[in-house]
């Protein structure tokens, strides 16, 4: 009897370790959505990017659903420019032990409110009557709706890939940066952005069936105040949404540095935005990652 008890005591740590490993393996895959206009798409030169981004990603699976909505994820590598989400993804990737998924839909110079940009440019408008009369934007068929590009792109990703994951998947948040192109009619921004947030949440919930996705976290970055396209009424509307809608969180980017065009984040600014967005994800318990808040300026200069 004593020998049996000793064996049981010796085996207990092994059993706990195995159960912890199995629990980790069964944890749903994290999915992050990134959307907005040019500063979400990424305009900083990779010549200015922090050196750690050159290492690439081990666990990131990436789908850019603006150009096509085929439901396929692939590997991601930097091109001539980089975006704040590339920084976010790096630090999530560093802590990850399994694959995570990013669905991105961003297009430079795009507004939410109609008739704010040149004719033929797609918009983020989410009015139900307008959506019923328009198609999702993509590289093949044109189309005017970016809201449909995002939501139908996500639906395809779920159908073709995410729903087939043995461990399942969990949509963590939408990371959003936009507002410059709505500066001319800021009085309409609050209602139209609120409508868009509700639409995206409704469509994600329709796919996942998870009650929590009716309140899917929206993390909004403000427009830097030095931007030549800054309008305080846009920021006011974003902050009002952060107070009035559940699970909408505003990240203050008022002091972020810009390129010579006084519009787009420079390399340092892009890294700062990425780290602030990551910090909010971690604060909300939506990501397991950490990063030094100080911009990696030496690395940027040395690259």
Which residue ranges define each predicted feature?
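Bacterial N-terminal signal peptides that target proteins for export
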Residues: 1-11
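Bacterial N-terminal signal peptides
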Residues: 9-20
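Sec/Tat signal peptide C-region and signal peptidase I cleavage site
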Residues: 21-25
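Cell-envelope and extracellular/periplasmic
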Residues: 26-303
């Amino acid at each position: 009897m004593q020998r049996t008890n000793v064996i049981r005591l010796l085996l207990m740590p092994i059993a706990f370790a195995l159960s912890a490993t199995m629990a980790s393996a069964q944890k749903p895959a994290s999915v992050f959505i990134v959307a907005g206009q040019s500063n979400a798409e990424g305009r900083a030169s990779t010549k200015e990017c922090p050196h750690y981004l050159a290492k690439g990603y081990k666990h990131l699976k990436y789908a850019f659903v603006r150009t096509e909505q085929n439901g396929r994820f692939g590997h991601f590598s930097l091109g001539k420019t980089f975006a704040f989400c590339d920084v976010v993804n790096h630090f999530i990737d560093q802590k990850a032990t399994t694959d995570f998924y990013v669905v991105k839909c961003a297009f430079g110079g795009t507004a939410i409110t109609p008739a704010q940009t040149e004719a033929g440019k797609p918009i983020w408008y989410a009015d139900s009557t307008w959506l019923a009369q328009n198609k999702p934007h993509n590289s093949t068929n044109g189309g005017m709706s970016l809201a449909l590009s995002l939501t139908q792109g996500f639906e395809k990703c779920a159908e073709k890939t995410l729903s087939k994951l043995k461990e399942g998947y969990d949509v963590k948040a939408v990371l959003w940066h936009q507002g410059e192109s709505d500066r001319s009619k800021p009085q309409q921004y609050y209602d139209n952005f609120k409508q868009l947030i509700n639409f995206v949440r409704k469509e994600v919930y329709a796919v996942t069936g998870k009650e929590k996705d009716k309140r899917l976290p929206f993390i909004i970055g403000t427009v830097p105040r030095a931007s030549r396209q800054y309008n305080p009424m846009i920021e006011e509307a974003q902050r009002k949404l952060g107070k009035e809608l559940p699970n909408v969180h505003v990240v203050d980017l008022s002091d972020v540095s810009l390129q010579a065009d006084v519009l787009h984040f420079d390399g340092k600014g892009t890294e700062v935005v990425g780290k602030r967005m990551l910090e909010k994800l971690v604060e909300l318990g939506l990501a397991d990652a950490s990063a030094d808040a100080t911009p990696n300026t030496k690395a940027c200069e040395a690259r």
